[in-house]
Structure formats: C-alpha cells, structure tokens
Swiss-Prot record:
It comes from the Eukaryota. One of its GO terms (molecular function) is protein-containing complex binding. GO terms for biological process: actin filament organization; cell motility; regulation of actin polymerization or depolymerization. Its main location: cytoplasm. Residues 41-72 form a coiled coil. Keywords: Coiled coil, Cytoplasm, Cytoskeleton. The keyword Coiled coil applies. This is Probable protein BRICK1. Disulfide bonds: none annotated.
Length: 75
C-alpha cells in the first residue's frame, strides 16, 4: 500500500503547487487589470480637463481676433 500512496501523494502535492501557481498568476493579472483601469480613468479625466482648458483658450482667441479685425482696442 505504501508504494501506491507515494504516487498519489506526489500528484496531490503537484496539484496543490499548480493551484497555488495559478492563484499567483490570476492575482497578478487582476492587479494589472485594476491598475490599467485606474490609469485609464485618470487619463480620461486629465484629458477632459485639458480639453476644457483648450476650448476656453480657443474661445478667447476667437474673441480677441474678432476685436482686432474690427479695429477695437483690447483695453
């Protein structure tokens, strides 16, 4: 009987080692996905803020160009 238990025990230990390895990889993939999602949200937020600032600057430039074209003073 002892001879039959050794291969079974080895298979059980190997199975647990494989499961632990898979758990480590799964956990790492989840961490990477969480980071990428967070990075995506951060980038989108920053780009939206930058877009708002650029839009405001474009409007100011158009206003100033219109005043210059009409010959108005800027003061």
């Amino acid at each position: 009987m002892a001879g039959q238990e050794d291969p079974v025990q080895r298979e059980i230990h190997q199975d647990w080692a494989n499961r632990e390895y898979i758990e480590v990889i799964t956990s790492s993939i989840k961490k990477i996905a969480d980071f990428l999602n967070s990075f995506d949200m951060s980038c989108r937020s920053r780009l939206a803020t930058l877009n708002e600032k650029l839009t405001a600057l474009e409007r100011r430039i158009e206003y100033i160009e219109a005043r210059v074209t009409k010959g108005e003073t800027l003061t």
